[in-house]
């Protein structure tokens, strides 16, 4: 039988997803299983790798059952996943922590502050092309070293979420450069682990898995897992990449000069460039096809529309209805202007910025209010584009994705 299907896995923050995709990129079957995000205390965010694996098995079984002869038709497996979640495993491949810190875990703020006080930011920026931040795995390891030294002592390898799933599938340990580019441990020029940054942060270099290209075959599907799923042992499992770099690839943002606007809860603006842009105003992520994504994240985004829907309609109207109401106001919303900083703003000079309406008049109605909210987010994106550092050209094409791309008015 022809092997004409590909099994895709996404280790998301909200859940585990699997899909069967044909050679033309059509999704023939899809399955999703939610998993818990654990918040032991304010600022912490954890998940159990065991839950990811359970979700992987369950969703793979589900999609295989939806397509005729699917197990015999699968040609290869590839995973992507949430970035920065730091899984330490021991010699036997067991996580040394039952629950691991995720990308949105803020417990590492003291470690970042201590590092900056000790080493500054200039040298790390020059090597990694990124500023120190609580999300980066380097500082998660620093926190574990200080607070859970026994877990670090038992560990032999650091993996990211999709890498741990890959390990369970193949028994092979590896990371990929897209994940490593946002670890604060990789030299952006050589695209290899940096001994200097490991020493500066206090990360044991021996923990860092070999870096493999996303399109490389990591290994074959383990016989035990294959038997459990009804798949062929030895099926090629690719290295894969982080979820956001994969999303850029999937949306066709693949060459220097292109841009991406992913507006969901927040807005992530990414411009592709041949080289990283070493500037404290931006972050840099390597894409699966080897181009650098110069990115900035705006706290303002779909969350502003969500707030307006709740505040003005008590969530009784759909997002489509809210957008339709906004179409009844003229461009400029009758002189009404909205600053969308409902939870502060990362790129503003003052991070305690707050949202405000300017220009309210007696005749201002819901249409103007909703249009002003949409336009306020767009103006924030434009501000980022207008203040790009020297050396960064304006994009010749921007591809919009996520929830914001569903609104014709917003686009």
Cite the ranges covered by each PLM segment.
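A generic structural motif
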Residues: 34, 102-103, 284, 299
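Short beta-strand-loop/turn "lid" adjacent to the catalytic site in phosphate-handling enzymes
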Residues: 65-103, 128-137, 166-187, 210-213, ...
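N-terminal glycine/serine-rich phosphate-binding loop of ATP-dependent small-molecule kinases
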Residues: 1-98, 110, 114, 126, ...
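Short secondary-structure junction motifs
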Residues: 15, 71-74, 206, 333, ...
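Residue-level signal for inorganic ion chemistry
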Residues: 25, 48, 77, 105, ...
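Structural signal for short hydrophobic segments within the conserved structured cores
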Residues: 29-33, 209, 358
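Short, acidic/turn-prone active-site loops that include or flank metal/cofactor-
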Residues: 33, 101-108, 265-267
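Active-site core segments that coordinate phosphate-bearing ligands/cofactors
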Residues: 2, 7-8, 109, 116-129, ...
């Amino acid at each position: 039988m022809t092997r004409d299907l590909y099994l895709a896995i996404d280790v998301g923050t909200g859940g585990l997803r699997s899909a069967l995709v044909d050679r033309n990129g059509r999704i023939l079957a899809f399955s999703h299983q939610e998993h818990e995000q654990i918040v032991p205390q304010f600022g912490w965010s954890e998940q159990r790798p065991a839950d990811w694996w359970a979700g992987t098995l369950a969703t793979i079984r589900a999609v295989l059952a939806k397509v005729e002869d699917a197990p015999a038709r699968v040609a290869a497996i590839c995973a992507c996943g949430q970035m920065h979640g730091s899984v330490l495993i021991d010699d036997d491949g067991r996580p040394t922590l039952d629950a691991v810190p995720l990308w949105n875990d803020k417990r590492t703020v003291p470690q970042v502050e201590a590092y900056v006080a000790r080493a500054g930011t200039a040298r790390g920026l020059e090597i990694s092309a990124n500023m120190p931040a609580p999300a980066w795995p380097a500082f998660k390891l620093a926190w574990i070293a200080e607070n859970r030294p026994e877990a670090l002592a038992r560990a032999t390898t650091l993996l990211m979420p999709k890498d741990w799933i890959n390990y369970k599938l193949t028994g092979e340990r590896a990371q990929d450069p897209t994940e490593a580019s946002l670890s604060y441990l990789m030299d952006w020029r050589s695209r290899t682990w940096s001994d200097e940054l490991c020493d500066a942060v206090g990360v044991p270099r021996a923990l860092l898995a070999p870096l493999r290209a996303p399109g490389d075959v990591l290994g074959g599907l383990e016989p035990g897992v294959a038997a459990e799923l009804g798949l062929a042992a030895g099926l090629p499992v690719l290295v894969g990449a982080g979820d956001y770099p994969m999303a850029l690839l999937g949306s066709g943002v693949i060459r220097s000069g292109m841009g991406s606007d992913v507006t969901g809860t927040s807005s992530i603006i990414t411009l592709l460039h041949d080289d990283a842009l070493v500037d404290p105003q931006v972050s840099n992520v390597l894409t699966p096809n080897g181009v650098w994504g110069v990115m900035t994240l705006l706290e303002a985004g779909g969350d502003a529309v969500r707030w307006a829907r709740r505040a003005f309609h008590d969530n009784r109207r759909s997002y489509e209805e809210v957008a339709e109401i906004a179409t009844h106001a003229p461009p400029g919303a009758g002189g009404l202007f909205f600053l969308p900083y409902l939870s502060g703003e990362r790129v503003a000079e003052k991070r305690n910025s707050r949202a405000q309406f300017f220009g309210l008049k007696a005749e201002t109605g819901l249409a103007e209010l909703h249009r002003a909210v949409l336009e306020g987010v767009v103006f924030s994106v434009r501000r980022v584009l207008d203040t790009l550092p020297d050396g960064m050209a304006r994009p010749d094409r921007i591809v919009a994705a996520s929830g914001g791309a569903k609104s014709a008015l917003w686009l």
